[in-house]
Amino acid sequence: MKILVALAVLALVSTQLFAEDIRANDDLNYWSDWSDSDQIKEELPEPFEHLLQRIARRPKPQQFFGLMGKRDAGHGQISHKRHKTDSFVGLMGKRALNSVAYERSAMQNYERRRK
C-alpha cells in the first residue's frame, strides 16, 4: 500500500514539474510573439483576419445612424411638424393616448379610403 502511495506522489510531483517547465517557456514566448505584427498576420487565416479588422475599425460619428435614422446637423426633424399631444409615435408605430380620439381618427381614415 505504501508503494502505491509513493508512486502516486511521485507521479503528481513529476507532472507538476513538467507542467511548470512548459508554462515557463510559454510565458517567455507569449509576449515576444505578439510584438511582431508581421508574424501574426502570416499565421492568421484570411476570414479571421478580416473579422478582426472589422472589429478594430470604428465608424466615424457622422456614420452612425442608430434607431432614429440619419440626423441633420442644422435642425431637428420635429421642428417642421405640428406637435400633436393626443398621440405617441414610437418604434411600434402610432399609438393614441386618448383611445376615443384614436378610434374616431381611425374611422375617419377608413371613411376617407372608402370614397
Curated annotation (Swiss-Prot):
Residues 1-19 form the signal peptide. The record marks 59-60, 63-67 as: Cleavage. Tachykinins are active peptides which excite neurons, evoke behavioral responses, are potent vasodilators and secretagogues, and contract (directly or indirectly) many smooth muscles. It comes from Oryctolagus cuniculus. The keyword Secreted applies. The lineage of its organism: Eukaryota, Metazoa, Chordata, Craniata, Vertebrata. GO terms for cellular component: extracellular space; synapse. This is Protachykinin-1. Residues 20-56 form a propeptide. Belongs to the tachykinin family. The modification Methionine amide is found at residues 68, 92. It is found in: Secreted. One of its GO terms (biological process) is tachykinin receptor signaling pathway. Keywords: Amidation, Cleavage on pair of basic residues, Neuropeptide, Neurotransmitter, Secreted, Signal. GO terms for molecular function: substance P receptor binding. It holds the Pfam family Tachykinin. It comes from the Eukaryota. PROSITE patterns: TACHYKININ. SMART domains: TK.
